C-alpha cells in the first residue's frame, strides 16, 4: 500500500523543513525513499517497473520512451559520497581560492637524513657490539677452563723473564690453578645471581602469579638436569679440550630442540621437505656424541660424559620448540603447559636460580677433586699472589754470570728508589702518625713485575701483630746449567678476568635484546649469533698459530703463564679446513642455523618486553650466544589471516567510481563476504582472528573553540582517515598484510550546541554552524585540492542531535550535538557518553561471546582529543606501540606542545618543556605517569571497562570536594582510577601533538585555578590509598609514593620558598636589613591575599597582574643578588652548586631534545614570572578553590537571550553571581536547571506582548469594552479571557491565539519535555539544509534514553542544595587556605629566624673553605726579624632548615635528571624502531613484484588514492601558481580550465580515486596516466614502469586475466583499463540478478560508472521530479 508524501513544492536545492507527525510512523517505502535522498513533488511511490526504469535511466533519454504516468525515482547525486554535486555557478563567479598550503608534518630533510644516519650507525654498533661481546665472552671463558687444564703441567713461556736462556719454562701447581676454578664458578653463577635479583624484585614489587606444585617441581627437575649438564661440560670436559675444539663443541647443544622441532612441525604443503631437513639436523647434532671422541683419542675417557652433558644442557629450551599446532596431542598438551609456565616464571626462578648456583658448586667440587685436593681449593685468598718459579735451561757459565749481574743491578736500583720514596714520605707525615713501612718493592725487569724478599715486614713498633710475616724467598736460584727466577703472580688477575667476562656477557645480552626491541634482529642479533662461534674459532686458531711461532705473543695482554690450550691447533688454514673434525663442526653449525631459523623471521611488535622476546629469564655465561639464540621465542605474535581482514561490502547507492558488480564482491582471499560490521561500527558480528586488529575511536570534546582551532583538529582527523584508507586499500587490493593496520572512527561531542530562539525552540548555535562551515576547508587543506564533502546525515537524538559525515577515506565522523536541557554537559559527561556508547552499547551489548569481548576490548583504544589539538598519524602509531608492548598499560600520552602568540604562550612553551623533559619522564621511569592529558591520550578499552573505572567515573558529584576533584580535573581523576585498579600510564616523548594554550593572563590563571586544586586532591586521594595502590599496581612502589609525597610537599612550600628567595635577593642587592626586606616583600603579598579572599574574581586578576609585574621587575634584583652571593660564597657553596645544577640540567635536557631546543629560549620570561606563577598563582588557586566554573573559552550569551535565564529562579545554568562572589562558586553547574523551564518564561513574555497589543487595539476601537486576562505565574494556572460577542473576527482570532498559547504554556509547566523535545526547527537550519534526514535505530534510541535517565540527566538543584553546596565549597576554601598559609608562614619564619641567628645555630659546609693568611711579627723571642704566619680557615655557615630543603630540592633534581637520561634512551630506541631505512633498499629494477609491493604498499596506495588531479588530464592538472612569475601564471587559461571542470562531477572519496587509477594503470599506456601530474614524477612510486608492471600483475592475479583490447574512442582521462573491461564482462550476470534490498529500491543500470552524464536529465510530463 502506497503512502502519500508531502506535496509542498520545493526548489531545486530546497530542503524539507517540515516534520512528520510524531504519532505517525512512515512505512518502509516512504522512509526508504527519504533514506536514499529521493523526493517526490506529488503522487505516490511507484511500484517496481524494471522495464520502464531500464529504458528511462540510460545515458540519454530515448525519444520513444513514453511519458511516465508515475513518478520515476531519480537518484540524489548530491548525496553520493564519491563526488561533489555540481551546483549552479554563474559565469562571472569563476575566480578561485587556492587551498591552504600543506602543513609541515615532517621535520625537514636534515632531520630525516640524521635519522637515517642514526639508524645506520645503530645497525653497525649493534652488530659489532653483539658479535664482539659474544666472541669475547666465549673466548675468555674458554681461557679460564684452559687454565684449569694446565694444572700440574710444565709449559713453555716467553723468555723475557730470563732473557739469557733460549727457553723459559714454568710448572703450574694446584695453587696456581685454583683461582681459575673459582673464576669459572663465579662466571657461571653471576648470571644466575642476577636472575635471582630480578625475580625477587618482580616478586616483591609486582603482582605475579604463583606456580602450582606440579609446575614448580617440573621446572626444578628440568633446570637441575640442565645445571648438571653445564657442570659436567665446564668442569669435566672443557679442561681436557683445546680451545678450538671447546668452541666448536658449543654448536652441538641443540639435540633436544632438534627432536622437538620435528614432532612440533605443523602440517603444510612443504612439510615433507622440512621434516627431511629436521632429521638431517638431528643426525648432525647426534654426531657430537660419537664423532668427537673418535677423532680425538684423548677424549675417550669422556665417551659417556659428552653425550650426557650435551643432552642435559639442551633440555633447558624445550618450551620454545613445542607448538600448539603439532599433529601429536602430547606435544600440544606440553605446549599449553609451557604457556602456563611462562606466566609464572618470576616466582619460580626466584628459588631455581639459587638452586642452580648450588648445583654448580657441587659439580665444581665433584669434578675438580680428581685434579686437586679439597684443601687446595679451600685455601685462603685463592685470588692473591702466588710464588712462581721460572726456569731457564741450557745456560753456560757466561750466561749465568750475565744473568746474576743484571738481577743485582735491578735490585740495587729498586732499593735506591724505595729509599728515596720512603724518605720523602717520612718528611711529609706528622711525627706521631708514622705509618708502617712496606719493604716489598716492585722491580721492573723488562715487561714483568717482581717482588723480592718479604711481602710484608712489620715495623718494630706498634701494629706488629696485625700483619703477620710471610715466608722469605730468594730472588733467584743458580744451578749448574740452569737458573730459576722466583717471582709472584699478579694478584686478582683471575677476578678481573671474571669481571671482564661477565661484562661481555651482560653487554651481549642487552645489545641482543635492544636489537630485537628496535626491529634490528637480523643484523643486530641473528647474524652475530650465527657468526659468533666461527669468529671465535678463527680467533683462537689464529692466536694459537701466532703463539706457536712466537712464545711471547700475547704477553702484553695476558700474564706469562696464562694462555689457551692449543693442542694440534697450529696447523695451517688449509689443513684446518680439510680435517674431519672441521667438517663435523660445520655440520653442527649448519644444524644449529636451521634449528634457530626463526631468528631470521621476527614477528614481534616494536619495543617488545623481555618476556615477549625470551622464553626464559636467564642466560648462561659459559655460552651466552647459544643460550640467547635458543631462548629467543619462535612465536611472537598471533597471525591474522588475510581472509579475516574484512571490509564492508560496498553499496551501489554509496559508490560512484567503481567497477560494475564489484561493489558486492570482494577480491579473492582478501575479504570475507560472510560477515559485516555492526551498525556501521568497527566490531564484526562473527568471530575471527581480525578481532585482534587495532580499533581506534577518536573522541573529541568541543565547546567554544574558534574556527582555527576546529580546523586544526579536523585536519588531524582527516589525516588519520587518509592514512587508514591507504592501509585499507593496500590490504584490500594489493593483498599485503600491514602490521600497523588499524580501523578508525571519529566522534565529536559538542557541548552547549543549542540556543533557544524567540519561540522557545532549540536552534544550533554559531559554533556548530562554524564547524559545519570549516569542515570542507580542513579537508581541502589535507588533500590539497578544493574539497566538498558529502552533505551529512542529520538525526534527532534523545540528547539533542547528531550529524554523520563520511570522510574521504570512507571512515565516519559523528558530531554529537548536546542540548543542555536534555543531557548534562561539560567534558566529563561527554566522556561518560562515549564510554557507555562505544564500550557499553556497541561492545558489551552487541557482542555475545565473552572471549571475543576480551580480545576486542584489549585491542580497542579510545583516542581522547580536545577541540583544538593538532597531531599526525605517526604520533598515534607510537602510542599504539606502547599499548601493544604492555598488556597492563591502561593509558599512554604524548608530548604536548603549546601553540599561540604572546608572552603567556612563550612562558608555557618553556614550562611544558621542563614539565615533560623532567617531571613526566621521571614519573614514567620510576613509577608511572600520574596524569594523561585528555587533549591527546590513548586509553585501552579493557582498562576503562574494569571495575571502579568507567562506573565510578560516571558518579554524580555529591560532596563539595567532588566538584573539585571530579569535575575540575577529569583527566587526572580518570588516570587515578586506572592507577588504583593496577593499570600503568606511560609517556612517549616522540609522540607529538600541538594544542592552543591560553594567550591571556586571565584565561591562563583561570585554567591553572582549575588544575592546581584538582591535582592536589587527586594526589592526596592516591596517597591515602597507597597501601592498596602499591599492592595492586606493579608499577608503583613505596619509593614512588614517597617521591609523590615529596613533590606534594614541594608544591605546598613553593610560595614560601620563592618568598624567602626574593627577601634574600633584595637584602643582598640593596644592602638592606633582612627585616626591612621582609616588610617590603610582605606588603604586596598580604594585599593580594586579602583581595583574593574578599574581592570579585575580575578584581583579583587585575591585582595579580599588577603585583606580578612588580615582582617581575624585582627579579632583576634576584639576578644581581644571586651573582653577589655566588661571588661571596664561592662556586663550592650549596647555593652556587644548586644554581649551576639547575642551569646545567635545563641546558642538558634541551641538548638531549634537539628538535625542542628552541623551547629553552623563553627561559628568561619563565625566570621573570617565577614569583607570579609559583607564589601568586598558588595563592589565587587556593583562595578561589570554591569557584568551580570552567574559566576558559567562556562565550557569554547575547543579552536578549540571557534575560530569561537570569529571570528564572533556581536555574544554575547561568547563575546570578556576576556581581556576587558568594554565587561565583555555582557557575559551573550549568548542567542544572530549576523547577521552571526557560521555555515557559519565553511563552509568558510572548503572551504578555500579545495581551498588551490586544488591549491597546481594544481600547482604541472599543474603549468601553471590558476585558480581563489573567496570566498566572510559571507554577501553574491558565489564562481566562471573557469573550465579547461584539469583537470582530480579527480580535477573536488574536484572542484564540492567546488562549492557545496560554494552554500550551500550562502544558509546558506540567511537562518540561514539551515542544523543545518535539521541536525539529534546528533540522531546518540553513547550515544543514543540504543534510539528509535519518532516524536512530529503536535499540540505540532506547539506549540513549536509558543512559540519560540513569547517569546523564540534567542536574536539578533546589535552593537548599545550592546553599549547602555553596557553604561546603566555601568551607573547603577557608580550611585549605588557612592550612596553606600557616604552613608557608611557619616555614618562612623558621628560615628567616635561623638566617638571622645562624651564628648561634648553624651547620658548617665542608666544601670550599676560605683561608685568611696573616703574617705578624713574633715578639715572644724578642727578635724583630722573626715573623709568624697565621692561617685562619673559615667555613660557610648554613641554617639547618635551609640546608635541609636545599638538599631536598637537589635530590628531586638529581632524580629527575637521571630519569630523564634513561627516558631519552628509551625514546631514542622508539625513534630508531620506527625509522624506516631507505638507503640499502634494492633499486626498483632489481625488486621483484612481491618485494616492491611489500616494501611500498602503503605509500603506493597513498599515491593512488590522492584526490588531487583525479578528474583532470595529466596536462590539465592545476599546479600551484603562487611560486611562478607573473608572466608564467597563465591566469586566463587556468580560470577557463577551472570553469569547465566545475561543470563536471568531481571524485570526492579516496576509494574511488584509488580504483580509478588502479584499474586504469597499464604498462602499455602513456607514462603519464590519468590523474597524475607531470610535475615531480620522479618522486612518485606509481609512475615508474617497474611499479606499474608490478601493480598490473598483482591486479591480474586478484581480479582475473587482462583483456588487451583498447578503446581508442575513449578519452585518456576516462579510459577504461584492461582490467575494467574484463571485470565488466565478469560481473554482467551478477548485475542482472540484483534485487531490491531492505534499504530501498536499487537502480539497475547497464551504463558504466565512468560514463555517467554530468547532469541528470529531466523528462517532460505531468509530474515534476525534484531532488533535495
From Swiss-Prot:
Cytoplasmic side stretches: 1-116, 198-212, 264-271, 323-347, 509-522, 598-1045, 1096-1100, 1158, 1397-1440
Alphabetical keyword list: Cell membrane, Coiled coil, Developmental protein, Glycoprotein, Glycosyltransferase, Membrane, Transferase, Transmembrane, Transmembrane helix
Disruption phenotype: RNAi-mediated knockdown causes a severe delay in larval development with most animals arrested at the L1 larval stage. Arrested larvae have a disorganized and larger pharynx grinder probably causing feeding defects and thus a delayed growth.
Region described as Disordered: spans on this chain: 1-51, 1192-1216, 1625-1668
Predominant subcellular localization, coarse grouping: membrane
Stretches that traverse the bilayer: 117-137, 177-197, 213-233, 243-263, 272-292, 302-322, 348-368, 488-508, 523-543, 577-597, 1046-1066, 1075-1095, 1101-1121, 1137-1157, 1159-1179, 1376-1396, 1441-1461
Pfam family, one: Chitin_synth_2
Superkingdom field: Eukaryota
GO BP annotations, alphabetical order: chitin biosynthetic process; positive regulation of nematode larval development
Catalytic reaction(s) noted: [(1->4)-N-acetyl-beta-D-glucosaminyl](n) + UDP-N-acetyl-alpha-D-glucosamine = [(1->4)-N-acetyl-beta-D-glucosaminyl](n+1) + UDP + H(+)
Subcellular location: Cell membrane
Ranges facing Extracellular side: 138-176, 234-242, 293-301, 369-487, 544-576, 1067-1074, 1122-1136, 1180-1375, 1462-1668
EC number, UniProt record: 2.4.1.16
Family annotation (InterPro entries): Chitin_synth (IPR004835), Chs-1/2_IV_N (IPR055120), Nucleotide-diphossugar_trans (IPR029044)
Glycosylation site residues: 396, 1303
Biased composition (Polar residues): 1628-1639, 1647-1661
GO cellular component, one term: plasma membrane
Coiled-coil regions, chain positions: 1280-1335
Signal peptide (from-to): none
CDD domains, per the entry: Chitin_synth_C
Function of the protein: May be involved in chitin synthesis in the pharynx during larval development.
Family statement: Belongs to the chitin synthase family. Class IV subfamily.
Name of the molecule in the record: Chitin synthase chs-2
Amino acid at each position: 500500500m502506497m503512502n502519500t508524501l508531502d506535496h509542498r513544492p520545493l526548489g531545486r536545492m530546497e530542503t524539507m523543513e517540515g516534520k512528520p507527525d510524531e504519532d505517525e510512523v512512515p512505512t518502509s517505502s516512504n522512509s526508504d525513499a527519504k533514506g536514499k535522498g529521493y523526493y517526490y513533488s506529488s503522487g505516490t511511490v511507484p511500484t517496481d517497473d524494471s522495464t520502464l526504469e531500464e529504458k528511462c535511466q540510460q545515458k540519454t533519454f530515448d525519444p520513444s520512451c513514453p511519458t511516465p504516468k508515475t513518478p520515476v525515482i531519480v537518484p540524489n547525486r548530491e548525496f553520493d559520497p564519491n563526488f561533489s554535486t555540481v551546483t549552479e555557478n554563474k559565469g562571472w563567479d569563476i575566480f578561485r581560492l587556492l587551498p591552504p598550503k600543506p602543513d609541515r608534518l615532517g621535520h625537514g630533510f636534515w632531520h630525516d637524513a640524521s635519522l637515517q644516519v642514526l639508524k645506520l650507525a645503530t645497525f653497525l654498533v649493534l652488530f659489532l657490539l653483539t658479535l664482539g661481546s659474544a666472541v669475547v665472552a666465549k673466548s675468555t671463558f674458554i681461557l679460564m677452563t684452559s687454565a684449569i687444564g694446565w694444572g700440574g703441567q710444565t709449559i713453555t713461556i716467553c723468555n723475557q723473564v730470563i732473557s739469557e736462556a733460549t727457553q723459559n719454562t714454568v710448572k703450574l701447581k694446584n695453587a696456581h690453578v685454583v683461582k681459575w676454578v673459582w673464576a669459572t664458578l663465579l662466571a657461571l653463577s653471576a648470571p644466575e645471581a642476577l636472575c635471582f635479583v630480578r625475580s625477587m624484585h618482580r616478586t616483591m614489587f609486582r603482582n605475579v602469579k604463583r606456580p602450582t606444585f606440579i609446575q614448580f617441581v617440573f621446572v626444578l627437575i628440568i633446570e637441575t638436569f640442565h645445571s648438571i649438564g653445564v657442570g659436567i661440560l665446564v668442569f669435566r670436559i672443557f679442561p681436557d679440550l683445546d680451545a678450538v675444539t671447546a668452541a666448536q663443541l658449543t654448536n652441538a647443544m641443540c639435540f633436544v630442540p632438534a627432536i622437538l622441532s620435528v614432532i612440533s612441525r605443523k602440517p603444510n604443503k612443504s612439510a615433507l621437505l622440512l621434516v627431511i631437513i629436521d632429521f638431517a639436523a638431528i643426525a648432525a647434532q647426534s654426531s657430537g656424541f660419537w664423532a668427537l671422541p673418535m677423532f680425538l683419542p684423548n677424549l675417550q675417557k669422556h665417551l659417556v660424559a659428552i653425550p650426557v652433558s650435551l643432552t642435559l644442557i639442551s633440555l633447558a629450551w624445550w618450551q620454545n620448540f613445542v607448538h600448539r599446532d603439532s599433529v601429536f596431542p602430547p606435544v600440544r598438551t606440553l605446549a599449553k603447559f609451557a604457556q602456563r609456565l611462562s606466566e609464572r616464571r618470576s616466582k619460580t626462578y626466584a628459588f631455581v636460580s639459587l638452586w642452580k648456583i648450588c648445583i654448580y658448586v657441587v659439580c665444581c667440587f665433584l669434578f675438580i677433586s680428581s685434579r686437586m685436593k679439597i684443601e687446595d681449593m679451600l685455601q685462603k685468598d685463592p685470588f692473591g699472589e702466588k710464588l712462581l718459579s721460572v726456569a731457564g735451561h741450557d745456560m753456560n757459565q757466561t750466561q749465568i754470570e750475565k744473568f746474576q749481574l743484571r738481577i743485582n743491578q735491578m735490585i740495587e736500583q729498586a732499593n735506591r728508589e724505595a729509599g728515596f720514596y720512603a724518605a720523602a714520605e717520612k718528611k711529609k707525615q706528622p711525627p706521631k702518625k708514622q705509618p708502617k713501612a712496606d719493604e716489598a718493592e716492585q722491580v721492573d725487569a723488562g715487561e714483568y713485575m717482581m717482588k723480592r724478599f718479604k711481602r710484608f715486614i712489620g715495623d718494630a713498633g706498634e701494629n706488629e701483630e696485625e700483619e703477620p710475616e710471610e715466608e722469605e724467598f730468594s730472588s733467584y736460584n743458580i744451578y749448574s746449567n740452569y737458573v730459576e727466577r722466583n717471582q709472584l703472580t699478579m694478584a686478582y688477575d683471575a677476578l678481573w678476568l671474571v669481571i671482564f667476562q661477565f661484562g661481555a656477557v651482560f653487554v651481549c645480552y642487552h645489545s641482543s635484546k635492544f636489537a630485537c626491541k628496535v626491529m634490528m634482529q637480523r643484523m643486530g642479533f641473528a647474524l652475530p649469533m650465527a657468526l659468533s662461534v666461527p669468529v671465535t674459532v678463527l680467533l683462537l686458531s689464529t692466536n694459537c698459530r701466532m703463539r706457536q711461532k712466537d712464545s711471547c705473543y700475547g704477553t702484553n695482554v695476558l700474564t706469562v703463564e696464562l694462555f689457551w690450550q692449543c693442542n694440534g691447533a697450529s696447523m695451517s688454514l688449509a689443513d684446518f679446513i680439510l680435517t674431519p673434525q672441521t667438517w663435523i663442526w660445520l655440520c653442527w653449525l649448519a644444524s644449529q642455523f636451521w634449528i634457530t631459523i626463526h631468528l631470521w623471521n621476527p614477528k614481534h611488535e616494536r619495543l617488545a618486553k623481555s618476556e615477549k622476546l625470551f622464553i626464559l629469564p636467564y642466560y648462561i655465561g659459559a655460552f651466552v650466544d647459544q643460550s640467547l639464540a635458543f631462548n629467543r621465542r619462535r612465536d611472537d605474535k598471533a597471525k591474522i589471516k588475510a581472509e579475516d581482514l574484512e571490509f564492508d561490502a560496498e553499496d551501489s547507492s554509496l559508490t560512484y567510481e567503481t567497477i560494475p558488480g564489484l561493489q558486492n564482491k570482494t577480491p579473492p582471499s582478501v575479504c570475507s563476504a560472510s560477515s559485516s560490521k555492526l551498525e556501521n561500527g568497527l566490531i564484526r558480528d562473527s568471530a575471527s582472528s581480525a578481532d585482534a586488529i587495532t580499533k581506534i575511536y577518536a573522541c573529541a570534546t568541543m565547546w567554544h573553540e574558534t574556527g582555527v582551532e576546529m580546523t586544526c583538529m579536523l585536519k588531524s582527523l582527516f589525516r588519520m582517515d587518509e592514512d587508514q584508507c591507504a592501509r585499507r586499500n593496500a590490504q584490500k587490493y594489493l593483498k599485503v598484510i600491514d602490521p600497523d593496520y588499524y580501523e578508525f572512527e571519529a566522534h565529536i561531542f559538542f557541548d552547549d550546541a543549542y540556543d533557544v530562539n524567540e519561540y522557545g525552540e532549540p536552534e544550533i548555535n554559531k559554533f556548530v554552524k562554524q564547524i559545519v562551515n570549516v569542515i570542507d576547508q580542513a579537508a581541502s587543506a589535507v588533500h590539497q585540492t578544493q574539497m566538498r564533502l558529502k552533505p551529512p546525515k542529520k538525526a534527532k537524538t534523545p540528547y539533542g542531535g547528531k550529524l554523520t559525515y563520511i570522510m574521504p577515506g570512507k571512515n565516519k565522523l559523528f558530531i554529537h550535538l548536546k542540548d543542555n536541557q536534555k543531557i548534562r554537559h561539560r567534558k566529563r559527561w561527554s566522556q561518560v557518553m562515549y564510554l557507555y556508547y562505544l564500550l557499553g552499547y556497541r561492545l558489551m551489548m552487541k557482542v555475545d561471546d565473552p572471549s571475543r569481548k576480551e580480545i576486542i576490548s584489549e585491542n580497542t583504544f579510545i583516542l581522547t582529543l580536545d577541540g583544538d589539538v593538532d597531531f599526525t598519524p605517526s604520533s598515534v602509531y607510537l602510542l599504539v606501540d606502547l599499548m601493544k608492548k604492555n598488556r597492563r598499560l591502561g593509558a599512554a600520552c604524548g608530548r604536548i606542545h603549546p601553540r599561540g602568540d604572546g608572552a603567556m604562550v612563550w612562558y608555557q612553551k618553556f614550562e611544558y618543556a621542563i614539565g615533560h623533559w623532567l617531571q613526566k619522564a621521571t614519573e614514567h621511569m620510576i613509577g608511572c605517569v600520574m596524569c594523561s592529558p585528555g587533549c591527546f591520550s590513548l586509553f585501552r578499552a579493557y582498562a576503562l571497562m574494569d571495575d571502579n573505572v568507567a562506573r565510578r567515573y560516571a558518579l554524580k558529584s555529591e560532596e563539595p570536594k567532588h566538584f573539585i576533584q571530579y569535575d575540575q580535573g577529569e583527566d587526572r581523576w580518570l588516570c587515578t582510577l586506572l592507577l588504583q585498579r593496577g593499570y600503568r600510564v606511560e609517556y612517549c616523548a616522540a609522540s607529538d601533538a600541538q594544542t592552543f594554550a591560553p594567550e591571556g593572563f586571565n584565561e591562563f590563571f583561570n585554567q591553572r585555578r582549575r588544575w592546581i586544586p584538582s591535582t592536589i586532591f587527586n594526589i592526596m586521594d592516591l596517597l591515602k590509598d597507597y597501601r592498596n595502590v602499591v599492592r595492586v599496581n606493579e608499577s608503583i612502589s613505596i619509593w614512588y609514593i614517597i617521591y609523590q609525597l615529596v613533590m606534594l610537599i614541594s608544591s605546598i612550600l613553593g610560595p614560601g620558598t620563592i618568598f624567602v628567595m626574593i627577601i634574600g635577593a633584595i637584602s643582598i642587592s640593596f644592602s638592606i636589613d633582612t627585616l626591612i626586606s621582609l616588610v617590603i616583600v610582605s606588603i604586596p603579598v598580604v594585599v593580594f591575599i586579602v583581595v583574593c579572599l574578599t574581592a570579585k574574581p575580575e578584581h583579583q586578576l587585575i591585582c595579580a597582574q599588577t603585583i606580578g609585574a612588580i615582582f617581575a621587575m624585582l627579579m632583576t634584583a634576584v639576578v644581581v643578588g644571586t651573582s653577589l652571593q655566588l661571588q661571596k660564597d664561592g662556586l663550592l657553596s650549596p647555593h652556587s652548586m644548586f644554581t649551576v645544577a639547575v642551569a646545567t640540567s635545563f641546558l642538558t635536557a634541551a641538548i638531549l631534545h634537539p628538535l625542542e631546543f628552541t623551547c629553552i629560549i623563553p627561559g628568561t620570561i619563565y625566570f621573570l614570572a617565577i614569583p607570579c606563577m609559583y607564589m601568586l598563582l598558588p595563592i589565587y588557586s587556593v583562595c578561589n578553590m570554591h569557584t568551580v566554573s570552567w574559566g576558559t573559552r567562556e562565550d557569554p550569551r547575547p543579552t536578549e537571550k540571557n534575560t530569561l535565564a537570569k529571570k528564572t529562579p533556581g536555574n544554575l545554568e547561568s547563575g546570578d553571581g556576576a556581581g556576587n562572589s558568594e554565587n561565583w562558586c555555582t557557575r559551573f553547574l550549568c548542567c542544572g536547571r530549576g523547577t521552571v523551564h526557560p521555555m515557559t518564561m519565553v511563552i509568558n513574555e510572548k503572551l504578555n506582548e500579545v495581551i498588551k497589543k490586544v488591549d491597546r487595539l481594544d481600547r482604541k476601537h472599543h474603549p468601553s469594552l471590558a476585558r480581563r486576562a489573567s496570566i498566572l505565574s510559571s507554577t501553574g494556572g491558565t489564562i481566562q479571557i471573557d469573550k465579547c460577542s461584539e469583537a470582530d473576527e480579527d480580535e477573536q482570532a488574536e484572542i484564540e491565539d492567546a488562549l492557545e498559547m496560554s494552554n500550551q504554556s500550562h502544558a509546558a509547566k506540567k511537562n518540561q519535555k514539551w515542544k523543545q523535545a518535539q521541536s525539529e526547527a534546528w533540522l531546518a537550519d540553513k547550515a544543514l539544509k543540504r543534510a539528509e534526514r535519518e532516524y536512530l535505530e529503536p535499540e540505540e534510541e532506547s539506549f540513549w534514553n536509558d543512559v540519560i535517565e540513569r547517569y546523564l540527566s540534567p542536574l536539578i538543584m533546589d535552593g537548599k542544595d545550592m546553599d549547602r553546596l555553596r557553604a561546603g565549597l566555601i568551607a573547603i576554601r577557608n580550611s585549605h587556605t588557612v592550612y596553606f598559609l600557616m604552613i608557608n608562614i611557619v616555614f618562612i619564619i623558621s628560615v628567616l629566624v635561623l638566617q638571622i641567628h645562624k651564628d648561634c645555630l648553624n651547620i658548617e659546609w665542608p666544601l670550599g673553605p676560605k683561608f685568611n693568611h696573616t703574617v705578624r711579627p713574633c715578639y715572644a723571642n724578642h727578635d724583630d726579624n722573626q715573623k709568624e704566619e697565621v692561617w685562619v680557615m673559615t667555613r660557610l655557615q648554613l641554617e639547618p632548615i635551609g640546608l635541609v630543603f636545599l638538599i631536598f630540592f637537589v635530590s628531586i633534581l638529581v632524580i629527575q635528571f637521571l630519569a630523564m637520561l634513561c627516558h631519552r634512551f628509551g625514546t631514542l630506541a622508539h625513534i630508531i624502531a620506527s625509522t624506516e631505512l631507505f638507503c640499502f633498499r634494492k633499486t626498483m629494477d632489481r625488486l621483484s613484484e612481491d618485494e616492491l609491493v611489500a616494501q611500498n604498499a602503503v605509500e603506493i596506495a597513498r599515491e593512488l588514492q590522492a584526490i588531487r588531479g583525479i578528474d583532470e588530464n595529466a596536462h590539465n592538472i592545476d599546479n600551484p601558481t603562487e611560486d611562478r612569475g607573473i608572466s608564467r601564471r597563465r591566469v586566463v587559461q587556468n580560470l577557463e580550465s577551472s570553469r569547465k571542470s566545475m561543470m563536471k562531477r568531481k571524485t570526492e572519496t579516496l576509494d574511488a580515486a584509488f580504483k580509478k587509477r588502479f584499474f586504469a594503470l597499464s604498462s602499455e599506456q602513456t607514462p603519464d596516466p590519468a590523474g597524475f601530474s607531470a610535475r615531480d614524477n620522479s618522486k612518485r612510486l606509481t609512475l615508474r614502469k617497474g611499479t606499474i608492471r608490478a601493480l598490473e600483475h598483482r591486479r591480474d592475479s586478484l581480479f582475473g586475466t587482462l583483456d588487451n583490447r583498447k578503446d581508442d574512442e575513449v578519452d585518456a582521462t576516462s579510459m577504461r583499463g584492461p582490467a575494467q573491461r574484463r571485470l565488466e564482462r565478469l560481473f554482467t550476470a551478477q548485475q542482472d540478478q540484483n534485487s531490491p534490498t531492505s534499504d530501498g529500491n536499487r537502480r539497475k543500470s547497464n551504463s558504466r560508472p565512468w560514463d555517467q552524464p554530468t547532469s541528470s536529465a529531466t523528462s517532460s510530463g505531468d509530474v515534476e521530479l525534484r531532488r533535495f
